Amino acid sequence: MPHNSMLKENRLFKPTDEFRRQANISGLETYQALWEFADKDYLTYWSDLARELITWKKPFMHIFDDSEAPFYKWFSDGTLNVSYNCLDRHLPDKADKTALIFESDFGQVQLYTYAKLHNRVCRFANALRELGIKKGDRVIIYLPMLVEAVIAMQACARIGAVHSVVFGGFSASALRDRIEDAEAKLVITANAGLRGGKIIPLKETVDEALEMGCKTIENVIVFHRVNIDTPWKKGRDLWWNELTANQPAFCEPEWMNAEDPLFILYTSGSTGKPKGIVHSTGGYLLGALNSFRNVFDNKPNDIFWCTADVGWITGHSYVCYGPLANGATQVIFEGVPTYPDPGRIWRMIQRHKINVFYTSPTLIRSLTRLGDHIPNKYDLSSLRLLGSVGEPINPSAWMWFYEVVGKSRCPIVDTWWQTETGSIMLAPIPGVTATKPGSCTLPLPGIMAEVLDENGQKCAVEQGGALAIKRPFPSMLRTIWNDPERYKSTYFPAEYGGKYYIAGDNAHRDKDGYFWILGRTDDVLNVSGHRLGTMEIESALVASPKVAEAAVVGKPDEIKGEAIVAFVVLNDFRPEGEEARQLAEELKAWVSNEIGKIARPEDIRFADNLPKTRSGKIMRRLLRSIAKNEMITQDISTLENPQIIGQLQQQWL
């Protein structure tokens, strides 16, 4: 069956004998024993792993504390340092091992050994301390995909500062919101970034954000990436290289309590205000470390490449922390996968002899459209394992990845997890689990996942329901920054008894117990693996002086997974024809400027008003059907203004 016509694929794909023979976990009996042990003696399972995998300054005695549930604590009397676990402990036997292979936008390659990376992290950490940054202070990192982003994150972890990385594609107002919520003291940025041959003026965006408020910011550290004129505020702005030039090459780690915050990462919420997800030091590190080792079957000589930006959780767990804590070698790429030509990504795999390749369904789908002949021109024989992250992967893209890229010999680990979970929750163990295209298969040992109906009962086979995790796990978020009540109501809702972690995704299980993710239950869109709140986009549209009202929904998109459709009511008229097309383009650019290009609507439609019930509630379900060009089958008897349906169906592309 050709890849492009496949809607469902029912075959099971078992790991090859060759892969299974060398896998870290290979026997079904071994895997089942591990799973049963985790199920029966849950706390011993996690405490054994924590003692085996993490280097502790002060070993923990207390494994788990649920006395303030759902604010759970793990290993709470132990002390450690994440940077020490990622760098220092490898120096006795891995000082000269390559930690990072950096490839720039224009193809220049730089290697960083563990010793060199340790040196750079320590120098930068000492510079931060010299500026008065101390344990618990919040630091915003707004950098391109450079080694310096990892250095900045590790340096914060080393001195106990709480970093909050903001994706470099976010706008000044989005950056300001995050700075103000975190009450950060410092911003770390670059004068500009390079992507696809284009210069991205990051420092200008930082300046614009700080002009809007952000009174807590004392300094801005600027890495010189591009030779351009850089706007400068004397007394506040400092050059990275000047700060670090004379710093000592060792920085004593700050020994942190396991429950101290490691970082805040903002993720979109359905109410419009981004949620500051707080991750702990000990539990988060254990999750990233253990999942990297098992899901990616980590080997001492592997070259690993995760294409995620560090502005997202995948870049935290499987670029900055998981690989380095395991002493692995990985690639960091500054540029765009199809620049300067469509073969870039495959040429990099050939050039660096990459063994494990972890990327998003959006990228896979965009590469399939370019044709099989492009990857077939390159030697991809170094690959032994492929991975997918960020959204469900459709079976046709899975099969293309498996057959064309992996030559039907590389297992695919389709992983489900979230910013909030910190590490992978559901995924195949590649030497054991038979895979099904489109399914993230089974929970990892120690993760007790289930699909629940609206009464909190286990769903029947193939019945859709809410994906839940029934027991706390070490890498889960600890709270929402400055909003503990929102944490409780969002993740431990009363309708499920307040005791289960409710992921906000719908799923079902098949007859083999495999999980299939069906999509978001709330008003959060998943665009190219990035979560965007509908309320945030609606707020941006309404901020335009021309817009009176807006409603945003998603529709399926074969490249992005989900595309943004906006229904807009203007202040005084409804445009048609060329005028509507021009206004739609203007509003798309407006949203890009307000939030970032990732939030640019694919389709904007104009109406005299929005479909509302007589109580004034917008009928979003109806809008979703219209966006998908579906026949309207739902009950519209409560619709106050049925005459506008025809207007809402008109596209001005």
Swiss-Prot record:
GO cellular component: cytosol; membrane
PTM section of the record: Acetylated. Deacetylation by the SIR2-homolog deacetylase activates the enzyme.
PROSITE patterns: AMP_BINDING (PS00455)
UniProt-listed GO biological process terms: acetyl-CoA biosynthetic process from acetate
Keywords per UniProt: Acetylation, ATP-binding, Ligase, Magnesium, Metal-binding, Nucleotide-binding
EC numbers, comma separated: 6.2.1.1
UniProt-annotated binding residues for CoA: 195-198, 314, 528
Binding-site list for ATP: 390-392, 414-419, 505, 520, 531
Nucleotide-binding listed as a keyword: yes
UniProt modified residues of type N6-acetyllysine: 617
InterPro entries xrefs: Ac_CoA_lig, ACAS_N, AMP-bd_C, AMP-bd_C_sf, AMP-binding_CS, AMP-dep_synth/lig_dom, ANL_N_sf, Pept_S26A_signal_pept_1_CS
Catalytic reaction list: acetate + ATP + CoA = acetyl-CoA + AMP + diphosphate
Cofactor: Mg(2+)
SUPFAM superfamilies: Acetyl-CoA synthetase-like
Record-listed Mg(2+) binding positions: 542, 547
GO molecular-function terms, A-Z: acetate-CoA ligase activity; AMP binding; ATP binding; metal ion binding; serine-type endopeptidase activity
PANTHER family: ACETYL-COENZYME A SYNTHETASE, ACETYL-COENZYME A SYNTHETASE 1
Role, per record: Catalyzes the conversion of acetate into acetyl-CoA (AcCoA), an essential intermediate at the junction of anabolic and catabolic pathways. AcsA undergoes a two-step reaction. In the first half reaction, AcsA combines acetate with ATP to form acetyl-adenylate (AcAMP) intermediate. In the second half reaction, it can then transfer the acetyl group from AcAMP to the sulfhydryl group of CoA, forming the product AcCoA.
Protein family (similarity comment): Belongs to the ATP-dependent AMP-binding enzyme family.
Designated name of the protein: Acetyl-coenzyme A synthetase
Source species of the chain: Pasteurella multocida (strain Pm70)
